Amino acid sequence: MSKDNIRQYSAPVYDGIENAPARSMMRAVGFQDKDFNRPFIGIASTWANVTPCNMHIDGLAREAEHGVNQASGKGIIFNTITISDGISNGTEGMKYSLVSREIIADSIEAVIGCQGYDGVIAIGGCDKNMPGCIMGLARLNRPGLFIYGGTIQPGEGHTDMISVFEAVGQYAKGEINAIQVKQIEEVALPGPGSCGGMYTANTMASAIEALGMSLPGSSAQDAISEEKRQDCHRAGEAVMNLLRLDIRPRDIMTKAAFENAIKVVIALGGSTNAVLHLIAMAHTAEVKLDLDDFVRIGQETPVVADLRPSGKYLMSELIKIGGIQPLMKRMLERGMLDGSCLTVTGKTLAENLAEVEDYPADQQIILPFEQPVKKDSHLVILKGNLSPTGAVAKITGKEGLYFEGPARVFEGEEGAMRGILDGEVQEGEVVVIRGEGPKGGPGMREMLKPTSAIIGKGLGQSVALITDGRFSGGSHGFVIGHVTPEAYEGGPIGLVENGDKISINAETREITLHISNEEMSLRRAKWQKPEPKYKSGALAKFAKLAAGADKGAVTDLNLDV
């Protein structure tokens, strides 16, 4: 059997008399003699019926397998997990969301490493699938690429998942009744695909395309479409080309490529989760990326997309005018992107964009750089005595650039949700939700229910929210998350008391707790570290291993090896 260099990993596992048992196992699943001479390509599928984001991915995986086989490889489908943030948000189950990113990366690494696959295609739909898949690819660094599962269609009346969350707040305010909430619930999500705005899934898919780790156009295709089917088929050809050229993920995932990804995320008005995930992905690829990079890049990159949650349009509408490729070409022509970066096509970013046509002249989704939504980044990195090592704010400018008010403190999301819905939270206040960090939560839950309730109750312009947890890509308003150090680690957010004045200045990038140093020291002396909430299982392991949010909350940063 062939032992050429494109079978570098499969040959030691399957070739030779000594490996007859391994071949026998594979014959049981349908392999024939000819298949053992082909490179083995693992296809990591996140298919599941637990969420519309992933319910169609089994078909996409089979299409990718067909593409691999037609390109003279041998595709082998295996599954990893997915969870649904949209279902678990606001519950104890949401603590597993960020944990699932690590489990996805671990499981892809484990299967590819164990089974001796020469290349990898990973297919993801829901939020944590994207970074988890990329981290899995980067760890073993075998030729591979990512396929995005695609976007859901809009619901009736231009609704989407966030419409349902905000309907709950409208109900609490008395603006709509229970029947109307149910009517929105029934029509907001019409079928397969990831949540339809520039929320976390579409943000990360766009970032991965800009990074060069998915095929051109992959991030902006409807979940059920001929374009997505072809994307999967072409991925089979692409991974075989990467094998022949010996191009590996870390050849593509350079510092310049990550900076391209950050710029595209900002231009699109993408999710705060991109900060967390891009830092984690870069760590796995052994690229130094930190919050200071987001500050530097953010000062020179405007927001030009009028997309939900802060804007008007849905991803399906951006798809109709050309997706993100014309935007990237505009950015390249302005010198904003590094066109020399290598991509999974085997070509540079500039080569991929050479023939891309501009958007239609009458479109209103992507604005001119001369008339941006915001002249600099909406992802504002804040530091100050409340967050010495950094926090991430999502401020488009529609909320204003400065907020000051008395603190309304809640120990965890559930208490905050009750306080908002019951009218405890008043205009002008700064809601502080703590004990939700990577270690303290554990799991760094998203505060989508509280932010949606604030918006639904009409407080979006008059209340700010600060947390050591995260936000959904669907959150909007004056929101600051990823506060570090987190409360569980003794961070200042754990010392805030009701009524303390807090100020947030997006222009100077400062977040300040207005108490004296002496008072801060007195409170710190009284502070006691909470007991871990979990003593065994996945959440306990994550709490023990997770780095701070400013380090991507990865679980392999401080291992004593």
From Swiss-Prot:
PTM annotation (N6-carboxylysine): residues: K128
Example GO molecular function: dihydroxy-acid dehydratase activity
Required cofactor names: [2Fe-2S] cluster; Mg(2+)
Top-level EC class: lyase
Gene Ontology BP terms: isoleucine biosynthetic process; L-valine biosynthetic process
Pathway: Amino-acid biosynthesis; L-isoleucine biosynthesis; L-isoleucine from 2-oxobutanoate: step 3/4; Amino-acid biosynthesis; L-valine biosynthesis; L-valine from pyruvate: step 3/4
Cofactor binding comment, as recorded: Binds 1 [2Fe-2S] cluster per subunit. This cluster acts as a Lewis acid cofactor.
Binding locations of [2Fe-2S] cluster: C53, C126, C195
A Pfam entry, by short name: ILV_EDD_C
InterPro entries hit by this protein: DHAD_IlvD/Edd, Dihydro-acid_dehy_C, DihydroxyA_deHydtase, DiOHA_6PGluconate_deHydtase_CS, ILV_EDD_C, ILV_EDD_N, IlvD/EDD_N
EC number: 4.2.1.9
Binding sites annotated in the UniProt record for Mg(2+): D85, D127, K128, E446
Catalysed reactions listed for this entry: (2R)-2,3-dihydroxy-3-methylbutanoate = 3-methyl-2-oxobutanoate + H2O; (2R,3R)-2,3-dihydroxy-3-methylpentanoate = (S)-3-methyl-2-oxopentanoate + H2O
Residue numbers annotated as active site: S472
Record text on subunit structure and interactions: Homodimer.
Entry function: Functions in the biosynthesis of branched-chain amino acids. Catalyzes the dehydration of (2R,3R)-2,3-dihydroxy-3-methylpentanoate (2,3-dihydroxy-3-methylvalerate) into 2-oxo-3-methylpentanoate (2-oxo-3-methylvalerate) and of (2R)-2,3-dihydroxy-3-methylbutanoate (2,3-dihydroxyisovalerate) into 2-oxo-3-methylbutanoate (2-oxoisovalerate), the penultimate precursor to L-isoleucine and L-valine, respectively.
UniProt family annotation: Belongs to the IlvD/Edd family.
Annotated protein name in UniProt: Dihydroxy-acid dehydratase 2
The encoding gene: ilvD2
